[in-house]
Amino acid sequence: MSMPATSTKTTKLATSLIDEYALLGWRAMLTEVNLSPKPGLVDRINCGAHKDMALEDFHRSALAIQGWLPRFIEFGACSAEMAPEAVLNGLRPIGMACEGDMFRATAGVNTHKGSIFSLGLLCAAIGRLLQLNQSVTPITICATAASFCRGLTDRELRTNNSQLTAGQRLYQQLGLTGARGEAEAGYPLVINHALPHYLTLLDQGLDPELALLDTLLLLMATNGDTNVASRGGEGGLRWLQREAQTLLNNGGIRTPADLDYLRQFDRECIERNISPGGSADLLILTWFLAQI
């Protein structure tokens, strides 16, 4: 793979450190997809609301993406002297090349396009922070990623083109900003909600898988998931948020017996053809940042 982007200076980061963060990104993707049972999502039990996807597609995709994560980190480091708003344009060709490898690995199935965007941003942010000898924490990573995306929502969603993209249509109809808005805001759903929730459950001694499933419910209840809205409309999104919040209000996922509630939720999502893919992407970031 050749580096399809220019940069302003060479990186001084150790290859071992870069590979360590890339490995965490790969593990985050695998941890999310293997987590079971997940309502409407591909997992070890079934394909959720995705008739065109299988667990193995996600495994192959994650491996293909792992090879590109060091490139995002390296570009973040090499562009550390650039204005943060200028970094995103340099990341785009890396992301597109990574996306191409994902599609080749899955024979054309879109498994992790959202994760390429979000993990790519976070990896570039890590590279920039390391290069500048600044503290690498979940908060500084997300704040740096946000600085890369300044103005992104205005540029890409608030347009009046005659042919709207799916994201533009959902923004104009429902006010949903999706992955762009969450990134530009510094991932507040992760930093302020999902990550502290997950870490608190772990501190309380809850099984890590149960803690992650409960955190997924929290994200589903609070996230304006454009994946859900594109499949189920505003009604489908409100239904999903309401059902997830009801499960949380009733105690959440604390014991293996509680998994029966998730299995029933999964069946209902499949019947409605609803998949909370945006929340799954944020869960990947939550696990990733929890390791840092």
UniProtKB/Swiss-Prot annotation:
InterPro entries: CitG, TriPribosyl-deP-CoA_syn_CitG. It holds the Pfam family CitG. One of its GO terms (molecular function) is triphosphoribosyl-dephospho-CoA synthase activity. Keywords: ATP-binding, Nucleotide-binding, Transferase. It catalyses: 3'-dephospho-CoA + ATP = 2'-(5''-triphospho-alpha-D-ribosyl)-3'-dephospho-CoA + adenine. GO terms for biological process: prosthetic group biosynthetic process. Its EC number is 2.4.2.52. The keyword Hydrolase does not apply. Catalyzes the formation of 2-(5''-triphosphoribosyl)-3'-dephosphocoenzyme-A, the precursor of the prosthetic group of the holo-acyl carrier protein (gamma chain) of citrate lyase, from ATP and dephospho-CoA. NCBIfam families: citrate_citG, PRK10096.1. Belongs to the CitG/MdcB family. This is 2-(5''-triphosphoribosyl)-3'-dephosphocoenzyme-A synthase. It comes from Escherichia coli O6:H1 (strain CFT073 / ATCC 700928 / UPEC). The gene is citG.
